[in-house]
């Protein structure tokens, strides 16, 4: 079964491995076909289902520590918004939450250095252009980018503005 294919076409299901972001309604629909559910990339522990998710906390803190160890204190983020596959529920990006919390704890968080849009190269491009226009000489020295697609657009905007990576600004992207 892929994406929005109908589960009703299946006569017998022993278990389901569901990949993606799912709303509570979608989880309940899947439960009707099999109690043996495992979710990948969707935290469903609070709904009583096993799941496999990325340890964003470790990844984000590792990246931020890398920047901090280099003496970089002005760190920005280009993030994206996600939603469930049925489009009914917005999902907070755990990378962004961790980024804000970690830098706030160190009294280094600058809201003006954070931009949020869609997970696309075009969005990365537009968000970085906005940051360049708004910050001018006050640009962060490093950026944590929440996806490779966003990073592609970010790099294009930096290149167009004559900002050299990694000489002027460092970036690390993590999907």
Region roles according to the model:
Residues 1-3, 52-62, 78-129, 145-152, ...:
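Hinge/beta->alpha junction and helix N-cap segments in small-molecule ligand-binding domains
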Residues 10-19, 76-79, 114, 136-147, ...:
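Periplasmic-binding protein-like
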């Amino acid at each position: 079964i892929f994406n929005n294919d109908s589960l009703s076409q299946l006569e017998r299901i022993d278990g389901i491995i569901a990949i993606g972001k799912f709303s509570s309604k979608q989880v309940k629909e899947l439960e009707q076909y099999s109690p043996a559910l495992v979710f990948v990339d969707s935290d469903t522990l609070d709904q009583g289902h096993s799941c496999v998710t990325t340890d964003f906390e470790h990844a984000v803190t590792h990246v931020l520590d890398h920047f901090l160890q280099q003496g970089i204190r002005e760190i920005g983020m280009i993030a994206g918004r996600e939603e469930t596959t049925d489009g009914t529920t917005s999902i907070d990006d755990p990378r962004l939450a961790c980024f804000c919390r970690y830098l706030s704890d160190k009294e280094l968080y600058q809201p003006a250095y954070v931009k949020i849009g869609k997970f696309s190269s075009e969005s990365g491009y537009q968000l970085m252009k906005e940051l360049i226009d708004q910050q001018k000489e006050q640009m962060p020295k490093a950026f944590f980018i929440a996806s490779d697609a966003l990073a592609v657009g970010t790099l294009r905007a930096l290149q167009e503005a004559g900002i050299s990576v990694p000489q002027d600004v460092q970036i690390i992207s993590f999907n």
